[in-house]
A protein has these predicted regions:
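Glycosyltransferase donor-sugar binding loop
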Residues: 219, 232, 246-259, 273
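Aromatic "clamp/platform" in nucleotide-sugar-dependent glycosyltransferases that forms part
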Residues: 295
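Nucleotide-activated donor-binding/catalytic signature segment of Leloir-type glycosyltransferases, i.e.
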Residues: 259-278
């Protein structure tokens, strides 16, 4: 196995739109594959075109404008969406996916690239026609819209739900990022995935950064689905007991949240916005305690990143978080606002408890959720597929 192709609509790159979890994962994954000597091809579409070569990395993002070029199809797709006619909307969404797959075929032929395997994400159903390339492919369950809708209440159109279902039921190889993820995909699509847990980079050296006493860090997008309202409520209670307490937001959307909820600026809140790389690690290492009150996750990557830095965490009572945290050993699971308040207050007041929880959290990630293990297990899975094709 020499060449791995990643078929994606999201990738963390300075010349691409801001990336979420999928794009960040593939950036980190690609870097690790290149370090191991593999050739990596990134192909997909997004709102910004990108074409380039850097050593063993080939990137080609086409501009996503299929429906702008086919406005009659867009008219019928929109009609199907508005009238909730799933088959009509899905029919034209499939045409877009088919067009992208055909462009991938043309790209591979033109550049004489022969991937040994293709990896792609589960959302938007973009794997639907990959079987036509006669190249083994793997779908990694980053969290498709149908799953997010069913379990966490996210919005999804009927047509998109239909093509995601069709694509996943058709996929010969599915990677799930946790036991909880595996269960959700099996219940929804009748397909049992292979568990390869996500992980974080544990090889970095700590960046010197003093801990801010009585600081609560919220690491993620400031929105209701991430439980930001809970974080604010808990913080306001903590501030009455600990007047010097501060809430630190590392992620997007804080100003938008304030506008949408008609809230004024809150005292003792520090908003860093979106951070990445060493700057992110430097800021996160200032935390005394992390709060993760999300209402739904297929995996807790941000949670793992905080624990990997040797920080105490208090997280929502979600199956995906319970997969990672052993309650009261390497973190805390909170079932309501009272418990968030009690656990964070205890971590503020008892330095020995905070230290013990933090040290055990770091060991948990190093042993079980190390990104190097994610890469190693993924490559072994690829090879197994290739050997049996």
């Amino acid at each position: 196995m020499k060449t791995i192709l990643i078929f994606t609509q999201e990738y963390l790159h300075s010349k691409q739109p801001p990336a979420g979890g999928t794009g960040s994962f593939y950036k980190k994954y690609t870097s690790s594959l290149l370090e191991k000597g593999y050739k990596v091809v990134i192909f997909g579409n997004s709102s910004v075109a990108l074409n380039g070569q850097d050593g063993n990395l080939r990137i080609c993002f086409l501009k996503r404008n299929y429906f702008k070029k086919h406005f009659i199809q867009e008219l019928f797709r929109s009609l199907g969406k508005r009238l909730k006619i799933a088959a009509l909307e899905a029919y034209f969404l499939k045409k877009e996916v088919k067009d992208l797959t055909n462009k991938l075929k043309e790209f591979l032929k033109k550049e004489n690239i022969r991937p040994d395997i293709i990896e792609t994400h589960d959302w938007n159903g973009i794997s639907l026609f990959l079987d036509e390339l006669s190249i083994p492919y793997v779908v990694r369950a980053h969290g498709c819209y149908k799953i997010l809708n069913k379990y966490f209440g996210y919005n999804i159109t009927l047509g998109l739900s239909l093509i995601e279902s069709e694509a996943l039921k058709k996929a010969p190889h599915l990677v799930c990022v946790s036991k909880n993820s595996q269960q959700m995909y099996e219940e929804t699509f009748g397909k049992t995935g292979t568990i390869i847990t996500n992980g974080v980079d544990c090889s970095h050296k700590p960046i010197s950064s003093d801990t801010i006493p009585f600081s609560v860090f919220f690491f993620g997008t400031a929105m209701l689905k991430k439980g930001f309202d809970t974080a604010l409520n808990v913080f306001n209670r903590l501030r009455k007991r600990f007047p010097e307490a501060t809430l630190h937001i590392v992620g997007r959307n804080y100003e938008v949240y304030l506008r949408e909820t008609h809230l004024e600026e809150i005292k003792n809140v520090v908003n860093y916005g979106f951070l990445d790389g060493d700057e992110l690690k430097e800021v996160l290492q200032k935390a005394s305690v992390f709060i993760f009150p999300s209402r739904g996750e297929t995996f807790g990557l941000a949670l793992c990143e905080a624990m990997a830095l040797g920080k105490a965490v208090v997280a929502a009572d979600l199956p995906s978080f319970r997969d990672i945290i052993t309650h009261k050993e390497d973190g805390f699971i909170a079932k309501n606002e009272d418990e968030y308040y009690e656990y964070i207050a205890a971590l503020f007041e008892e330095a020995s408890l905070n230290k013990s929880i933090s040290e055990k959290a770091q060991k948990t990630i190093e042993h079980q959720y190390n990104f190097e293990k994610t890469v190693k297990n993924s490559l072994a899975y690829y090879q197994k597929i290739i050997n049996t094709k």
